[in-house]
Amino acid sequence: MSKRTYQPNNRRRHKVHGFRLRMRTRAGRAILSSRRRKGRKSLAV
């Protein structure tokens, strides 16, 4: 029996999908701007 792959961890969650990480790269800022344009309630984790 294999183990479940999703092992929740808030620190890793923010390091991988967080707002600061998105702001760091040009591609990440593009993600945020497209989510703003779409009107997402939450932009990043």
UniProtKB/Swiss-Prot annotation:
Similarity field: Belongs to the bacterial ribosomal protein bL34 family.
GO CC annotation terms, alphabetical: ribonucleoprotein complex; ribosome
Protein keywords: Ribonucleoprotein, Ribosomal protein
BP GO terms, sorted: translation
Keyword Protein transport in record: no
UniProt-recorded Gene Ontology molecular function terms: structural constituent of ribosome
DNA-binding as UniProt keyword: no
HAMAP family per UniProt: Ribosomal_bL34
NCBIfam families listed in its UniProt record: rpmH_bact (TIGR01030)
Official protein name in the record: Large ribosomal subunit protein bL34
